[in-house]
Amino acid sequence: MDLEKLKKDTQVIIDDVIKQTEIKAGQVFVLGLSSSEVNGGLIGHASSSEIGQVIVSVIHKTLSDKGIYLAVQACEHLNRALLIEEELAEKKDWEIVSVIPQLHAGGSGQVAAYQLFKSPVEVEHIVANAGLDIGDTSIGMHVKHVQIPVRPILRELGGAHVTALKSRPKLIGGERARYK
């Protein structure tokens, strides 16, 4: 795998997704990542620390520079828990759980984020404003309603399918209501 190309493609994708989702400083962005799929394998069967490190580093720096919080989803072995900064967990009053991610229990993305974050903690439930799914990891459970699919400018990263979600407030009130 060409890690320089992976880095450049990740940057193109995250810049495009930020633009399309219109996520703002102070909001939460969830990342689901299968380095196995990026590597051309089956999800959970060809994990790569290097791939996880490259992708998460690019996304973390880009979001941090804009004041956006990153939440990295774990694999199903950790019940899709999320690695976030402790500051965010305290701000949102999200319950912290105890586990340290490993390559095959949490995944390469969480391991990379654990090393990059200032004070990483795991939580089981969040409500993110938008997110990026690299490798069909099913991030929808973590994005608030109403979710709207976003098609990134690049639809594949390595061998992985790439999609994203943004959210909008629910439209309530029926035929008499007016909306922006």
From Swiss-Prot:
InterPro entries (UniProt xref): Antibiotic_NAT-like, DUF436
Pfam families, A to Z: DUF436 (PF04260)
Family: Belongs to the UPF0340 family.
Name of this chain's protein: UPF0340 protein LL0489
Chain's gene name: yeiF
